[in-house]
């Protein structure tokens, strides 16, 4: 049942003025319960970084992804930490292809795992804090998305470590004693989930051929909203 009846929306607009964004707690919690068939529900803050919503999701077991120092700060303000949940997933993971000095200090100070999209990031992090937990964002050589703007894989994408460079990335991890958590592939966003049939086996194959010891694999892209 849609909680937003015309009368309800009219009353809210009169009470709070407009423009006004309205969210329904029961609906959000219900969607979280639907997704709990997955091992981990990790919410990308770029979709919505409202700290009230983040706190609500955190209270129901959701963890978050941050792609900027601002998003890290918002996650911290909403009550998230780098500590693992019951499933072993860190409350915050920082994902990027580049990292500046200030952000480097921030992730080190809070022990936030870094999902590294470049080998340079691994060297920077390893030199600053040997043993830090990391993920590897891998570009598998193919992409997918409902448009070119949302296609984040393949040879024309700036994102991720090219799949043939995985041995070099693992060597960088070993040289600095970094702790590899898992592999991540985000090749695009869209309404078609068939690409997961390519992404997940590609990650499994990379793990097998590389001999990497990982705790998890992660397929990015998110779940679309039925507009």
Segments (PLM) and residue ranges:
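A charged N-terminal "starter" segment
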Residues: 1-132, 171, 175-179, 209-213
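Glycine-rich, aromatic-flanked loop segments that form ligand/cofactor-binding clefts
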Residues: 131-143
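Active-site loop/helix belt of alpha/beta enzymes
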Residues: 140-227
């Amino acid at each position: 049942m849609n909680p937003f009846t015309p009368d309800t929306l009219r009353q809210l607009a009169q009470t709070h003025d407009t423009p006004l964004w309205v969210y329904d707690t029961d609906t959000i919690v219900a969607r979280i319960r639907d997704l709990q068939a997955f091992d981990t529900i990790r919410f990308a803050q770029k979709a919505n970084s409202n700290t009230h919503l983040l706190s609500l999701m955190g209270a129901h077991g959701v963890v978050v992804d941050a792609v900027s120092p601002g998003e890290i700060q918002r996650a911290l303000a909403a009550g998230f930490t780098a500590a693992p949940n019951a499933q072993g997933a860190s409350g915050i993971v920082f994902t990027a292809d580049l990292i500046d000095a200030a952000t480097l200090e921030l992730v080190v100070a809070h022990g936030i795992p870094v999902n590294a999209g470049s080998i340079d990031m691994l060297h920077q992090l390893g030199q600053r804090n040997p043993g830090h937990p990391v993920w590897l964002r891998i570009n598998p050589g193919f992409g997918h998305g409902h448009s070119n703007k949302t296609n984040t894989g393949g040879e024309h994408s700036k994102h991720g470590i090219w799949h043939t460079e995985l041995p070099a990335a693992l060597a960088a991890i070993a040289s600095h004693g970094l702790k590899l958590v898992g592999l991540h592939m985000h090749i695009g966003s869209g309404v078609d989930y068939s690409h997961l049939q390519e992404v997940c086996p590609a990650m499994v194959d990379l793990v097998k051929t590389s001999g990497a010891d990982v705790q998890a694999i992660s397929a990015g892209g998110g779940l679309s909203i039925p507009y």
